Design a protein with these regions (language model features):
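Class I (Rossmann-like) S-adenosyl-L-methionine-dependent methyltransferase catalytic domain
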Residues: 1-98, 112-119, 123-194
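A conserved beta-strand element that flanks and buttresses the S-adenosyl-L-methionine
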Residues: 104
Length: 194
């Protein structure tokens, strides 16, 4: 991982209202959407793993809205872990025994090299018994979508096909960043699958 995820990084991209990528309002809307779709698909939501939990916006949302959900948050940043209360773990090297109904991995994968991405997906799949929400900016996103004044562009720029290939073996795409672990108990209509 090329980036130092220190206080300066978090101030620049997440804590400053003037320069942050996302704030509470955006993550609240995203969390409602993700959990709403899981409810629509009939999935249980008892345990959540948040990989690269950063400033803890998902953690805060679950605490306010679904406080009975068992929530576990990880980050590689010593700063984020101390300030926001996460476990310090690297998903490319760590695989826990617990299984989760939802694994969240938002904005993490582009920091890994290719082998790190492969290990991260394998580890998340092993711990997922339901859904994965994955957000990873792609080379096209970097060219055409992101606000470069607010987005850390010091990442591995990869085509979407790279992530789709990695996920295909272990997850079924459902659209909007949501996937379901292969071999799970859910069946989806053709047009629900991404």
């Amino acid at each position: 991982m090329p980036q130092a995820f220190d206080a300066g990084y978090f101030r620049r991209y997440y804590e400053s209202r003037r320069s942050r990528v996302y704030g509470r309002e955006q993550i609240d809307a995203l969390a409602r959407g993700v959990t709403g779709f899981i409810g629509w698909f009939g999935g249980p939501l008892e345990a959540v793993l948040d990989v690269g939990a950063g400033t803890g916006l998902w953690k805060d949302w679950f605490g306010r809205n679904l406080p009975d959900v068992r929530y576990r948050s990880l980050d590689v940043s010593a700063y984020a872990c101390e300030r926001y209360g996460h476990e310090r773990r690297d998903i490319t090297r760590w695989r826990g025994r617990e299984r989760f109904d939802l694994v969240i991995c938002q904005g993490v994968m582009p920091y890994f090299d290719d082998q790190g991405c492969e290990r991260a997906v394998a580890n998340m799949a092993a711990m997922c018994r339901g859904f994965l929400y994955l957000e990873a900016i792609t080379s096209r996103d970097l060219r055409e979508v992101v606000d470069r004044s607010r987005t850390d562009v010091s990442v591995h720029a990869r085509p979407a096909s790279f992530y789709r290939r990695l996920l295909r073996e272990r997850f079924e795409p459902l659209g909007c960043g949501l996937h379901h672990v292969r071999g799970g108990d859910k069946v989806f209509y053709d047009l629900e699958r991404g």
